[in-house]
Amino acid sequence: MSLFDTINAGGAELLGFAWPTVWAVVRILVVSVVILLCVAYLILWERKLIGWMHVRLGPNRVGPGGLLQPIADVLKLLLKEVIQPSAASRWLYLIAPVMTVVPAFAVWAVIPFQAEAVLANVNAGLLYAMAISSIGVYAVILAGWASNSKYAFLGAMRAAAQMVSYEISMGFALVLVLMTAGSLNLSEIVGSQQHGFFAGHGVNFLSWNWLPLLPAFVVYFISGIAETNRHPFDVVEGESEIVAGHMIDYSGMAFALFFLAEYINMIVISALAATLFLGGWDAPFEFLSFIPGIFWLVLKVFALLSVFIWVRATFPRYRYDQIMRLGWKVFLPVTVVWVIVVGFWMMSPLNIWVK
């Protein structure tokens, strides 16, 4: 019996009919607190890593080695006044930052941390994740419109166009995973990557989806960078053009919520990429399978997040027309062609996904 089964059985015996509700609330709170801590130290890791790439030290004054810098940043933002422009639509202006964070948290309901460790093990988990992660752009549009500022509105329109341009390519990449796994359940998708010739010989990482679906994996991850408005796709908030885009009139914690959502979405994209293409909680080699699965998932997510940061420190910002061209003229045709190729592959005698 696993730890979760033991807790569940003990709680049901202690609290009776009220236990399912209490257990659900406890799991949601635990996951939410862990995500907030991860965001805080992801920001510190980003500043440290970029500092090292620039041959600097990065934050190193608050606490030992700068470990308390995230706490100092949060306290600073909490103490700042939330200023509202006189021409803004009051309630919409205040609701928009909250609307960016809620979908970012909601996606975690279906992401499995290891076998049987998931908030909601639903059969349509992949569809839910795709749908709920697309809602955040509406908050960006709302923020740009409610601010009643030309720069904010321009940033919001850029965000809408960018989301539409890359959401389709991401969707086709996920269709490929659905075709090969035969399920929308994220736990079953991880399970489908644990079979095959290489997995049977103990080399698990060669059985993961990243190898046969490599174009889809690359398109999904780069599209994820664009979806989160990260560098080099950050024309939505391009400092040299429109200062801060849709966030230009926000301050204090309202401003911080936009960045909180951005970093949560970075972790979501990395967690989904690890789950769909990198075997989720599966160990790369069979002889390492004694290590808890959540360790491997965290390691894969950390590696992908480091790629996010490396891309920011390395590449120049794309022009707006270059971003649109990449989405429509490169990624979309590549994913459509690969869907057709994999379809014929699965119908041929060389099908490697036979269950």
UniProtKB/Swiss-Prot annotation:
- Which regions span the lipid bilayer? 25-45, 91-111, 126-146, 170-190, 205-225, 253-273, 290-310, 330-350
Q: List keywords of the entry alphabetically.
A: Cell inner membrane, Cell membrane, Membrane, NAD, Quinone, Translocase, Transmembrane, Transmembrane helix, Ubiquinone
Identify which top EC class this enzyme belongs to. Answer: translocase
Decide whether keyword Metal-binding is in the record.
Answer: no
Q: Name one Pfam family in it.
A: NADHdh
- Per the UniProt record, which EC number(s) apply here? 7.1.1.-
Q: What InterPro entries does the record tag this protein with?
A: NADH_UbQ_OxRdtase_su1/FPO (IPR001694), NADH_UbQ_OxRdtase_su1_CS (IPR018086)
Q: Name one GO biological process term.
A: aerobic respiration
Domain of life from the UniProt record? Bacteria
Q: How does it sit in the membrane?
A: Multi-pass membrane protein
GO cellular component entries: plasma membrane
According to its UniProt entry, what is the function of this protein?
NDH-1 shuttles electrons from NADH, via FMN and iron-sulfur (Fe-S) centers, to quinones in the respiratory chain. The immediate electron acceptor for the enzyme in this species is believed to be ubiquinone. Couples the redox reaction to proton translocation (for every two electrons transferred, four hydrogen ions are translocated across the cytoplasmic membrane), and thus conserves the redox energy in a proton gradient. This subunit may bind ubiquinone.
Q: How does it assemble?
A: NDH-1 is composed of 14 different subunits. Subunits NuoA, H, J, K, L, M, N constitute the membrane sector of the complex.
What name has this protein been given in UniProt? NADH-quinone oxidoreductase subunit H
